[in-house]
């Protein structure tokens, strides 16, 4: 878990981060990526003079990321800060290879299918909980029903008072991740003005794209009341697009029909989409340098000549 060391890593020159998640489900990916995205954004905001995001747009989450809620065997910084376990913690999960989960409560007493607990956390029907029994074996059970401080199970278990209990499956959290859990939007600014018989709308985005669309409008009537909020709302109806209105300069003292604003907005969004595609710089693969010399004339097992194809490449370059 490198989340607490991101600032030091960026200071050391790291600009690309890879999150391990082989064979993990979509919930794991959503949770962990979102957690690190927020952690990176905090570092970038703290040092805005040094760092900028490599991408544009901001994702709005429908959940609060928490690493402890995804598969883990507890956490360690590994060898990132020192060569021995920090704070006396082991670098391996010796008690169980399964996910330990988050500490959530302690058992007050247990009888039959009922366990009374002491906790400040909310537990829901369907949550998966685990514990170590008195023999050190890792055990688990599913909560069938919650009745105040009592957990009602589907079958009796033997668990001693004072036993710490962990949550390995948070049903409410998993439900939040199962649907659309994030929406990414690019912030845009809008400016509305009238000149020489033309009503104009300018949209500009975070990447510096700027477009203007106009409609013929010989004159505008004075408004009987402030039209600013209504005009801003009409321009900000961007559902179904990648955009989100951040700021708008409008003409609150003039009356502009909603249908005119709607058509102007639609035309402007289409033009901004086109500008996005035209100005996007796609990295191109460089042409192969056929006469590039191999790094060594004589190769060894350490150079990883894995098969006949890699052998052909090395030989073609002089090895």
Where are these regions (language model features)?
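Surface-exposed amphipathic alpha-helical tracts and adjacent flexible/coil segments at the periphery
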Residues: 1-319
